[in-house]
Design a protein with these regions (language model features):
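A conserved beta-strand-loop-helix scaffold within acyl/acetyltransferase catalytic domains
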Residues: 2-59, 66-72, 133-243
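Acyl-donor-binding surface of acyltransferase catalytic domains
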Residues: 60-62, 67-160
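Short regulatory "switch" loops immediately downstream of catalytic or recognition motifs
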Residues: 222-223, 255-263
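Conserved GNAT acetyl-CoA-binding A-motif
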Residues: 98, 259-276
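Generic recognition of stable, solvent-exposed alpha-helical segments in well-folded globular domains
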Residues: 145, 167, 247-250, 254, ...
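Conserved acetyl-CoA-binding loop-helix of GNAT-fold acetyltransferases
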Residues: 94-97, 244-259
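Short, surface-exposed, polar/charged, turn-prone segments marking secondary-structure boundaries
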Residues: 82, 185-188, 259-263
Length: 279
């Protein structure tokens, strides 16, 4: 028996199944890189290998996680697919207190009350940034003024739900090239198109246009459970010529505002990740 298998036995994590993992995720939620639809996509479309584990207490399943390709907790492929690897939020009951037998340096700080053997100063040298419950009145006023100025200059807004996968792929690649030029590589076009096509239902948010031409697009993915909704901005791009109109700030504000309304209507907790805080 391998050492890792012994650790899982000692910490009460049992071998599980994808079906059970999906059920636990639907109840407790987690980060996008732990979402069962994402797992299913990489299992079926890319033949990736996953091992699932669950934690049972008082005849109830209180948590579950997986190991991807015998390497990591979570799906960490941010350079080739639009998936953030900034943090791992594992589906767990709020009252669960346990030891996690597998290592990760991306564990969400939200797990501090739950996972007893994590050394947080080592586990998270850089913290992921989650938006506040509400913006200040000054911030809201500034964004509203920017938005009105944007509209007066010929700006418009369109939901990503109203765009085809091919449209989204073309828009993002064009804006990415405008923003970064040759200084940074975009995702492979085939990967992006296939990902958008198969997981279109997880996309959330808006695209901004100036006089009918796309000028800002953040890839926001939504992970919803019975308890919460986790939104993650995996990447974003803007048209350089439009920077004076602050399209990036406006788009982020619109997407967060829409996410807040979405959660309030469903009486669920909002978790909106915008990435690692820079030191």
């Amino acid at each position: 028996m391998k050492i890792q298998e012994v650790k899982r036995i000692l910490t009460r994590w049992q071998p599980s199944s994808f079906t059970l993992y999906r059920e636990v995720f639907a109840q407790y939620g987690g980060s996008i890189n732990m979402h069962p639809d994402i797992v299913d996509y990489f299992m079926k479309r890319h033949n990736w290998h996953f091992k699932f584990f669950h934690y049972e207490e008082d005849d109830k399943i209180k948590g579950a996680y997986f190991i991807c390709n015998d390497q990591n907790i979570g799906i960490l492929t941010r350079r080739t697919f639009p998936l953030s690897s900034d943090e791992i939020l594992i589906p767990m009951a709020p009252d669960l207190r346990c030891f996690l037998p597998d290592r990760t340096n991306r564990l969400s700080a939200l797990h501090q009350p739950q996972i007893r053997n994590a050394i947080w100063k080592l586990t998270r040298k850089k913290q992921n940034c989650l938006v506040k419950e509400a913006f200040s009145s000054k911030f809201e006023k500034t964004r509203r003024n920017e938005y009105q100025r944007f509209l007066k200059k010929g700006g418009s807004v369109k939901s990503v739900a109203d765009c085809s996968s091919d449209e989204l792929t073309h828009i993002f690649i064009e804006l990415f090239r405008s923003r970064f030029g040759n200084t940074s590589s975009c995702y492979p076009a085939d990967n992006l198109a296939n990902f958008f096509s198969q997981l279109h239902h997880l996309l959330f948010g808006h695209i901004l246009y100036i006089e009918g031409i796309p000028c800002a697009f953040d890839i926001v993915l939504k992970s919803e459970s019975q308890m919460n909704v986790y939104f993650d901005v995996s990447n974003g791009a803007i048209k350089n010529e439009c920077r004076p109109l602050s399209p990036g700030s406006i788009l982020m504000w619109l997407n967060i505002s829409r996410a807040r309304n979405y959660c309030q209507e469903r009486q669920k907790k909002l978790l909106f990740s915008i990435g690692i805080l820079k030191p």
